[in-house]
Structure formats: C-alpha cells, structure tokens
Amino acid sequence: MKKVIYPGTFDPITNGHLDIITRAANMFDQIIIGVAASPSKKTLFSLEERVKLVEESTAHLSNVSTAGFSGLLVDFAREQEANVLVRGLRTTVDFEYEFGLTSMYRKLLPGVESVFLTPAEEYAFLSSTIVREVAIHGGDVEQFVPKCVYTAIKTKVAK
C-alpha cells in the first residue's frame, strides 16, 4: 500500500489544495493530509480549526485522512510510515523553494521521495495567503474555497 503525505498549513484549505488532494487520491492508496502547526506563522484559524476544515472538505474522499502535526515534516512522515511527500507547484518560485526542501528532506529521511503536482489552470494563482487577505479586507472568497471554509471565514472575519 502506497501511503503519502500532503503537508501544509492550510490556513485555509482552498479549492487549489482540494484539486491536488483529489488528484493525488486517484494516484495513491492512502493520502494523509498533514496540517502543520506552523507556530512562526500568524494564522487565521487554530490548528484544531484547520484540521476540522480539511476533514470536512475531504470527507467525500474515502482514502484521505487528516492529522495535525508540529515539528519536522520528516519526523511526521516517519511516524506515519509514509515515504512519499506530495507537493503542489504553482510557479517557478514554488519550484525553487520546493527543490531546496526536497534536498533537505532526503538528507534527513533517506528514501523519502517528493512528487510534485501542478494545479488545474484555474487555481494556478490561488493561495491561502491571498484568500485570507481578500477575506480580511471584506472581499468575497466563496469561489476559491470549499463551502464549509467559506462559512468559517465569514464567521471568523465578522468578529
């Protein structure tokens, strides 16, 4: 059984993330969405909220599970007994960053492989950062996120 991890902060999960997850779910036996605590980032949603939103957004995918983690991704991968990391690439900037990370992952966890997927064209510009910024400033992000996330964002930014 090929078990892979798709890691990220997912603050919030977007339709671009969901596109990558859905396509990876068709390629691998089991996908674990690793939701990173990312304490150095100022997140809109808590780790627990992000895990819940990812779970709700992927509930229709039977071979996808979600787990929060803190610390190194390679340690999480080792704990989950996964040796493949799925990463999304939108631009050449993403590629350069991910290429560096991949080299580090291989040093820290020999045998780990990274698989890169590009999003569907309509999501190539989309990022959680953009969604957060637009939402915080009163913009409508409904078309960019799953319905449960849209509802959660509206509630969160109304406070």
Curated annotation (Swiss-Prot):
Assembly and oligomerization: Homohexamer.
One cellular component (GO) term of this entry: cytoplasm
Cofactor: Mg(2+)
Protein family (similarity comment): Belongs to the bacterial CoaD family.
Enzyme class: transferase
Binding site for ATP: 9-10, 17, 88-90, 98, 123-129
Annotated residues for binding of substrate: 9, 41, 73, 87
EC number: 2.7.7.3
Pfam families named among the record's database cross-references: CTP_transf_like (PF01467)
Lineage of the organism: Bacteria, Pseudomonadati, Pseudomonadota, Gammaproteobacteria, Vibrionales
Protein name per its UniProtKB record: Phosphopantetheine adenylyltransferase
Role: Reversibly transfers an adenylyl group from ATP to 4'-phosphopantetheine, yielding dephospho-CoA (dPCoA) and pyrophosphate.
Gene name in the database record: coaD
Keywords per UniProt: ATP-binding, Coenzyme A biosynthesis, Cytoplasm, Magnesium, Nucleotide-binding, Nucleotidyltransferase, Transferase
Pathway it works in: Cofactor biosynthesis; coenzyme A biosynthesis; CoA from (R)-pantothenate: step 4/5
Residues at the site labelled Transition state stabilizer: 17
GO BP of this protein: coenzyme A biosynthetic process
Catalytic activity, reaction form: (R)-4'-phosphopantetheine + ATP + H(+) = 3'-dephospho-CoA + diphosphate
Localization: Cytoplasm
Disulfide bonds: none
Domain of life, source organism: Bacteria
Example GO molecular function: pantetheine-phosphate adenylyltransferase activity
InterPro entries given in the database record: Cyt_trans-like, PPAT, Rossmann-like_a/b/a_fold
